[in-house]
Each structure stands twice: as C-alpha cells, then as structure tokens.
Amino acid sequence: MEIKKRVSSTTRRNWILDSGLFLTALIASLSGIYFLIFPEGGYKGGRNPYYGIQIIFEREGWEWIHTWISFGFIAVGLLHLIFHWKWVVNTTSRIFHSLKERKTSMNKASRLNVLVDGVLGLGFLICALSGVYLFVVPEGKNGLGVDPMILFSRTGWDLVHTWSGVAFISAAIIHFGIHWGWVVKVARKMFTRKAVFATEQMTLSINQDI
C-alpha cells in the first residue's frame, strides 16, 4: 500500500526534539513546583506545616530528579536551538528591519508567536544559567557555607531561577497551545504510517507462509 502522506525527515526530527523537550521540561517543571509547594526548613509543629511530608520520593530524590532531568532538558534545548538557528537569525533580522523601517510584514498571529518564543527562549536561558550556578556554587553544610556573591546572593539567584522558570512554563503552555494542531497532525501521520507498515509486513509474512 502506498502512503501518500509522508513525514519529511526534518519534520520528524523536529517532532522528536519537541517531544524530548516536552517530557524533560514537564518533569523538571513538576519537580520544581514540588519545591515551591513544600519548602525546605522548619521543624515538626513549627511554621512549616509541610515539614517531613514525603510524596513518592524523599526531598533528596526530588532534588536528584530535578537536577539531572534539567541537565537533559538543557542539552535537548541546545540541540533544538542549533537546528532552528537559521529561523532565529532570520526572524531577528526581520524584527530589526521592521523596527528600522517602522513597518512590519508580520500578522498578529506571527507577532504573538515571536513574542511567546522570545519569552520562552529568554526564560530558558536565565533559568538554565541560574540553575547551573546554583549547582556549581557550593551551598555549604546546612546552608552555612561562604556565599561568593557573584552578582547576587545565593537567595537572589534562587529567586531568579524560580521566577524565570515560572515565565518559561507560562510561555511554554501558550507555545504548546499555539502549535497543538501541528503536534497532533505530525503525530497522526507518523504513527498511522508505522501501523500501516506493520500491517503490511504481517500480511506479507502470512502470504509467504501460505
């Protein structure tokens, strides 16, 4: 059977990259939200009512998941940026040209997409850099280590990491909503093609046995 609707290698690659981004971002975000809901510190019966509560894993387990899945997310994100670098350069050039000429060739949908992608990229960059800083710079035992105070205090970096993450998650949800049709369309083509191919192989095998 001839499959008329084929998925190009570029589209397939982009879909796989986006799927990897989605999964790693989802796990990193959920584990990050865990830390917002269940802050560290306090004592039993003290001001932190959630002290000592364990959900699936202990806090150290959530920290491990958040850290290493986030590194995986950064790696996939950099790959995504490399493969889409031409689009980034061309879009940036169009924006600066539009500002210079005081006119735009983009419609409202395109401008919204560029704005969301800009917030998404900036949030990713700041969140990733602040996260790497918090990972590399030692906190010290019980948080009593010497703070090197690079630009901000460690608390400042933690706040930057938190709110850039919130901005990234918000933009990612909007981005996902904008491109939901593309995600479903490509997924349907990819998996339908695989199902048809498997059926053809099974039919061919049966015919050969007969």
List each language-model region with its residue ranges.
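Membrane-embedded alpha-helical bundles that constitute the cytochrome b-like, heme-associated redox core
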Residues: 1-210
